[in-house]
Amino acid sequence: KAKQLETLKAAFAATPKPTRHIREQLAQETGLNMRVIQV
């Protein structure tokens, strides 16, 4: 869970408004649902 948070924080720091493609990639990496990864 901590690793998920770190991954998301890093991603949003790099791209404050991630595209759908980036969110899909994050969803796969973290194992979270796409809905969870919305801003």
Swiss-Prot record:
InterPro entries: HD, Homeodomain-like_sf, LIM_Homeobox_TF. GO terms for molecular function: DNA-binding transcription factor activity, RNA polymerase II-specific; RNA polymerase II transcription regulatory region sequence-specific DNA binding. Disulfide bonds: none annotated. PROSITE patterns: HOMEOBOX_2 (PS50071). CDD domains: homeodomain. Keywords: DNA-binding, Homeobox, Nucleus. Residues 1-39 bind DNA. The keyword Nucleus applies. It comes from the Eukaryota. GO terms for biological process: neuron differentiation. It is found in: Nucleus. One of its GO terms (cellular component) is nucleus. This is LIM/homeobox protein xLIM-2B. It comes from Xenopus laevis (African clawed frog).
